[in-house]
Amino acid sequence: MKKEKILKQIDKLKSIAIAEGIDLSSEINRLRGLLELESDDYKKEKEIEEVFSIVQNSRKVERPKPQDFIKALIKDFIELKGDRRFANDEAVIGGIGYFDKYPVTAVGIQKGHTLNENITFNFGSPHPEGYRKALRLAFQAEKFSRPILFFVDTPGAYPGIDSEERGMAQAIAENLYYLSDLKTPIISIITGEGGSGGALALGVSDILIMMQNAILSVISPEGCASILFKDSSKAAQAAVSLKLTSFDLLSLGIVDKVIDEGPGLDIDPQIGYKNLADQISTSLAYFSSLNQKELVEHRYQKLRKIGFYKDTTGFVKKGLNKSKNFIYELFKF
């Protein structure tokens, strides 16, 4: 029942109650309850619409991709290829250059703006050699004390048989393991999609930054809807449940900073570039001032806090002591 129709019925019942002197309060209250439900449904529909529009925005081909961010922010960039074990993965671009006065290593999971580019970049889904390339460059950055900038835009790691045969799970796990203890500043930026372990492999950092209209999730809304609702067409509802927007993740303490895009990266990327550059400058100045021990400890504490809810150790010990005392009193002779 529509909101306007319910309001008209309430007004009509009020008029009848006054004119006839009849108590219609129970029926009026019932309609008011329906009105509240209608308002809640409207709010839910609005939220679903807004969240899914962010998901669609994050996937737009017009949005700058990681290679565009590198081109805009990194001077004198020199690309370095290959993982030195199997092959060069075109889905991952990496190399060295300058951000302002800082020599940096920049690595990005890149997507294309055209069909041919997306075929070359495997639609932004890296193979194991892509993650091993990123880790090789990270070790090199540590050796030469260069900060690392990770730019992430991926629906997830490539799930094909060839990826499994070459050790995808191990490649991602090794990134998580070694990056958590790397003794050089790491800044990760989610520029578009941040899909599952494929994004997490470049997300271990001293500060995790998201562009305003980017998303980060353990699974795509379509995949989640297929599993939970058995219907991929309910992706919009799943997107709300996943809490995948930058502001959701900021409130949960998973993301550290959200970058204002202005009118949108697909409309005018320069505003987003400038705001991101300002944040990177601030972060590099701070993390470069820490010694290696302080840097790794900061990263450790940051990662440990994610998902932390409440320490119940004290309550458990107190409860155990009470139980022991009760049993002692019960059975003493």
Residue ranges and their predicted role:
Residues 6, 50, 106, 153, ...:
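Terminal peptide-recognition signature
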Residues 98-180, 185-191, 196:
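Cleft-lining beta-strand/loop regions that shape enzyme active-site pockets
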Residues 1-103, 111, 123, 274-333:
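Intrinsically disordered, low-complexity segments enriched in small/flexible residues
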Residues 2, 152-281, 285, 289:
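Conserved catalytic cores of soluble enzyme domains
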Residues 27, 31, 130-131, 224:
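Short, motif-level signal for alpha-helix interfacial/capping segments enriched in acidic residues
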